[in-house]
């Protein structure tokens, strides 16, 4: 799905599967691969602007209250900024600072010129990374990162299989 027309590609594959009767039947369907490692796990854990862990909606007062109590903080009732809107908002000045960890959008984004323009538009940009990437050229501060092999945790793949990672 990590392609300038990835969404359209997945929709086209889904439409073709539906046309030939391969949706809603056992052993059939479309399973597009996600663009980055552990995207599924991050989404499951609430790393999206519209949901908390377990895909519980931030706009639901009862859900928000539950997480406020568990986390001991007051939470914003509004949906946050989607990842695809961050760089356009940096260009317009709506986002003034950015912290990127473990990603090289200058290389991985389909529109490099757009990303560079956005990074240059920021007042302050922090990058945490293992290596000096193309994106690092635009950072005000570069912090050292750690690789998956240097920490413990889990990855959740596209089929929702959780894999444990040990040092």
Language model regions located:
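Non-catalytic alpha/beta scaffold blocks inside enzyme catalytic domains
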Residues: 1-26, 32-167
């Amino acid at each position: 799905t990590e392609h300038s027309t990835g969404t359209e590609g997945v929709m086209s594959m889904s439409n073709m599967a539906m046309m030939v009767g391969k949706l809603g039947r056992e052993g059939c369907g479309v399973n597009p691969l996600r663009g980055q490692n552990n995207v599924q796990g991050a989404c499951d854990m609430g790393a999206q602007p519209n949901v908390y862990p377990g895909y519980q909606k931030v706009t639901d007062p009862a859900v928000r209250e539950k997480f406020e109590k568990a986390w001991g903080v007051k939470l914003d009732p509004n949906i946050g900024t989607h990842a695809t809107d961050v760089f356009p908002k940096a260009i317009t000045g709506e986002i003034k600072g950015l912290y990127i960890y473990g990603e090289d959008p200058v290389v991985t984004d389909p529109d490099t010129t757009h990303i560079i323009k956005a990074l240059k538009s920021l007042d302050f940009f922090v990058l945490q990374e293992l290596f000096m990437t193309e994106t690092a050229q635009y950072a005000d501060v570069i912090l050292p990162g750690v690789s998956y092999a240097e920490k413990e945790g889990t990855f959740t793949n596209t089929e929702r299989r959780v894999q444990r990672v040990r040092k």
